[in-house]
Amino acid sequence: MDVSFINDKYDVAYPVVTGKHEMKAYKDNGKHIMNSYGILEPDPESNEEVSKDDLDVIIVPCVGFNEKRMRLGHGGGYYDVYLKESRTLKIGVAYEIQKLDDLIYEDHDIKLDLIITERNTY
């Protein structure tokens, strides 16, 4: 899906995995590279890095979540490390079917400020 129109209306930064448990945000000037998962992402060599402290909102994908706003990710820990000590608004996005009553989480897992599904906001 082409979402390039968003860049015309908002200042948007996209996540790029840059190392083990390391993720950074970059503006998108149209120059991309294919990552190891086959996903196009902004080329860190050609795009401006954005400090997480300069972001107004961070949209976080959820594999699963609970009503306490704890999320289950893909297991790499990238978002947990990136969001640690960040005061930026953290919004998770998921489908209601991904809600888990018995989600197990650990001390290093980051609680989100909101989780939005197609039916509810937590």
Label the model's feature ranges:
Residues 1-54:
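N-terminal active-site beta-alpha-beta segment that forms phosphate/nucleotide-binding
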Residues 1-4, 69-80:
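Short Gly/Thr/Asp-enriched flexible loops that form oxyanion-binding sites at enzyme active sites
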Residues 12, 59, 75, 115:
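Residue-level signal for inorganic ion chemistry
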Residues 42-46, 61, 85:
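Mid-sequence acidic-hydrophobic segments that form the walls
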Residues 53-58, 67-70, 80-122:
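Surface-exposed, charge/polar-rich loops and edge strands
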Residues 63-65:
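Short glycine-rich anion-binding loops that position phosphate/pyrophosphate groups of nucleotides
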